[in-house]
């Protein structure tokens, strides 16, 4: 209760905390951060009521994973200050311990880098600061006895660094449609906010029943409420633990942890593919692995224990946050530690990189907070992934004295979802909280659409790429649903993009997408039509741009023309005819000459990049073949174009 981890042998009686320890010992603790590099005072008042006089009892702090920092006494007049595995305690020192049935006061004073241990206000010894093994703080009996505790206090000057826009709304439990009596963990909200994935532990509804450690479940938004959570099925879940780490922005790729490695499953027409392992070269030494896939698919932020940890110690399970970046050749980089501005001697876990690619949420017990793991946020400052703003605590409406983690936000930033043991229906439950503008990630655009065969309007499975036309760099990738052709991708404002889909035996019609600067989330519809590579097909080069009134290519035309070069190289038997068209502003002769010159410029580009001139014919039509009336600038823009016709395959 109140965040304490305790067993059935612990209870409150007559305003005292009672531990009826067995021969195996018993303990009760709360997870609470102590900055051991700063001054603090830890005090405990306890009394042995019964049991052997030689049994040790006392307090512990900064402990975890079977390693403790302990100040213990026995009723026969002994004390121990110990750091490590309690099973290794061998040496006891004499002290004036009050006999059984009387209160003893233990006090640790940490001042100016020296730790002083007092018993009943008498100094026993001083030491240098002991190591940090975790955040557990509590009291313990190592043998059979009845132990009562009347006080435990920690005094330390700690500042909880709060966001100036900390959430003030109340959190809401998602209720019994989502949460069961078991642990419900690891929520992942889809980018569009319409699907919620979660992990359910030891549920009768798991593929392996109640003995199944973890299955993936999901729920869909039905307009005014979430549907009843369902098991994702046997194509994904097994009788063993199935650990879903991330979902791609297009909702068509799932990232799993399998045998301590990352693997992906792709959506198929009938469900999900078999897992394919990603070539990430590291070996996580921790029992836990949590990750987040960036919206552009080019970064995986994860929590792991590696030799590169800020406070690496093979004796304890302490995770840091790392990132692996997808390189131009499709391979993944070695892990990059996110740095000491984020990682601490404590544990950092459950990272979630928001759709803006810059705002990172994570849980930590290594910095001042409200209790156990608290949720924090930080913002990436550059592309090194090691420069971040100082993390801020998300505040008491989200964080409690208990475990709070697994924060996840859709692209809209309207709601956040997270896990807490506080105020739950069962054990760990999933909550939501409405966000206001000041505590949302940066606003983005969600582009949604379908990939279709232009000839028959049928959906296609394809890879979709978005590129910044100014920098010529890919800025996002997605996959379309093989059954429906649907895709979605997140893009920042203030950039002009080229959008294309790739599929064998098809030529993508490349679309131009202009996203002016803005600070409000919005959704844009954009279907992508793919043209089958067949004789007689006419294909428009959408992203080929010329200087006004000239046959001079603008720099942002290169990506489109480079892809045509690639298609011609991959299909060496194809011949094409380039066709140039203008708007109707000018004399026919001048417009005809301009269209012919522009065709010649495009042909020269292709030849310069390795395509035989004999494979390329060309013809200019001036303004004689418009596709619109040309009565507005928007219509004239559509008439100004370069196309090519496949003349031989």
Where are the predicted features?
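Short, solvent-exposed beta-strand/turn patches at coil↔beta or beta↔helix junctions
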Residues: 179, 533-574, 582-593
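Secretory/extracellular carbohydrate-interaction modules
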Residues: 22-85
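Short tryptophan-centered beta-strand motifs in secreted/extracellular beta-sheet-rich domains
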Residues: 42-44, 102-111, 115-117
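Short amphipathic beta-strand segments in non-cytosolic proteins
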Residues: 463-483
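Short, conserved micro-motifs composed of acidic
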Residues: 157-450, 454-455, 470, 477-479, ...
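A short, solvent-exposed beta-strand micro-motif common in secreted/extracellular proteins
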Residues: 485, 495-505
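Flexible glycan-contacting loops in extracellular carbohydrate-active proteins
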Residues: 127-150
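Periplasmic OmpA-like peptidoglycan-binding domain that tethers envelope proteins to the cell wall
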Residues: 364, 369-371, 571, 579-649
């Amino acid at each position: 209760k109140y965040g304490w981890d305790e067993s059935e042998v612990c209870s409150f009686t007559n305003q005292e905390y009672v531990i009826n320890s067995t021969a195996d010992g018993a303990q009760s603790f709360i997870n609470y951060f102590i900055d051991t590099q700063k001054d603090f005072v830890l005090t405990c008042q306890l009394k042995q009521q019964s049991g052997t006089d030689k049994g040790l009892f006392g307090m512990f702090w900064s402990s975890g994973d079977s390693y403790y920092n302990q100040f213990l006494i026995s009723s026969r007049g002994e004390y121990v200050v110990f750091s490590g595995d309690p099973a290794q305690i061998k040496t006891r020192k004499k002290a004036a311990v009050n006999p059984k049935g009387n209160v003893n006061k233990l006090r640790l004073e940490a001042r100016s880098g020296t730790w002083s241990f007092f018993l009943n206000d008498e100094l026993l010894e001083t030491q240098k600061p002991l190591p940090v093994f975790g955040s557990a703080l509590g009291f313990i009996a190592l043998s059979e006895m009845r132990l009562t505790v009347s006080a435990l206090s920690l005094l330390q000057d700690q500042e909880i660094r709060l966001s100036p826009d900390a959430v003030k709304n109340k959190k809401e439990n998602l209720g019994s449609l989502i949460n069961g009596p078991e642990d419900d963990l690891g929520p992942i909200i889809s980018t569009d906010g319409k699907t919620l994935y979660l992990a359910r532990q030891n549920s009768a509804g798991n593929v392996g029943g109640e003995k199944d450690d973890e299955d993936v479940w999901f729920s869909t938004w039905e307009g005014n409420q979430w549907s009843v959570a369902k098991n994702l099925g046997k194509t994904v879940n097994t009788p063993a633990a199935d650990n879903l780490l991330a979902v791609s922005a297009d909702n068509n790729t799932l990232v799993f942890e399998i045998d301590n490695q990352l693997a992906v499953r792709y959506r198929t027409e009938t469900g999900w593919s078999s897992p394919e392992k990603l070539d990430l070269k590291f070996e996580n030494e921790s029992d836990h692995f949590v990750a987040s896939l960036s919206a552009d698919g080019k970064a995986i932020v994860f929590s792991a224990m590696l030799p590169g940890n800020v406070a690496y110690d093979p004796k304890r399970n302490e995770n840091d946050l790392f990132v692996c970046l997808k390189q131009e050749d499709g391979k993944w980089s070695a892990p990059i530690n996110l740095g000491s501005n984020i990682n601490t001697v404590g544990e950092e876990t459950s990272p979630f990189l928001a759709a803006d690619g810059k705002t990172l949420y994570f849980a930590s017990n290594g910095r001042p907070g409200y209790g156990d793991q608290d949720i924090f946020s930080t913002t990436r400052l550059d592309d090194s992934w090691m420069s971040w703003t100082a993390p801020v605590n998300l505040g008491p409406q989200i964080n409690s004295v208990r475990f709070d983690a697994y924060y996840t936000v859709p692209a809209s930033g309207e709601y956040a979802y997270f896990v807490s043991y506080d105020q739950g229906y069962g054990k760990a439950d999933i909550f939501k909280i409405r966000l206001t503008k000041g505590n949302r990630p940066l606003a983005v655009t969600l582009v949604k659409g379908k990939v279709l065969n232009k000839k028959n309007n049928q959906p296609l499975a394809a890879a979709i790429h978005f590129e910044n036309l100014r920098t010529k760099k890919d800025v996002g990738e997605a996959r379309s649903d093989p059954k429906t052709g649907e895709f979605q991708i997140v893009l920042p404002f203030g950039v002009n993009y080229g959008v294309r889909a790739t599929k064998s035996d098809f030529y993508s019609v490349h679309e131009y997408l202009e996203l002016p600067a803005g600070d409000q989330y919005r959704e844009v519809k954009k279907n992508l039509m793919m043209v089958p590579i067949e004789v007689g097909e006419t294909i428009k080069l959408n992203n080929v741009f010329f200087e006004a009134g000239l046959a001079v290519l603008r720099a942002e035309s290169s990506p489109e023309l480079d892809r045509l070069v690639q298609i011609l190289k991959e299909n060496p038997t194809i011949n094409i005819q380039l066709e140039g068209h203008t708007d109707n502003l000018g004399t026919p002769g001048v417009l005809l000459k301009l269209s012919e010159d522009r065709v010649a410029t495009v042909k020269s580009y292709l030849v310069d990049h390795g395509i035989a001139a004999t494979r390329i014919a060309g013809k200019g039509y001036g303004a004689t073949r418009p596709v619109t009336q040309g009565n507005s600038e928007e219509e004239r823009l559509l008439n100004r174009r370069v196309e090519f016709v496949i003349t031989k395959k």
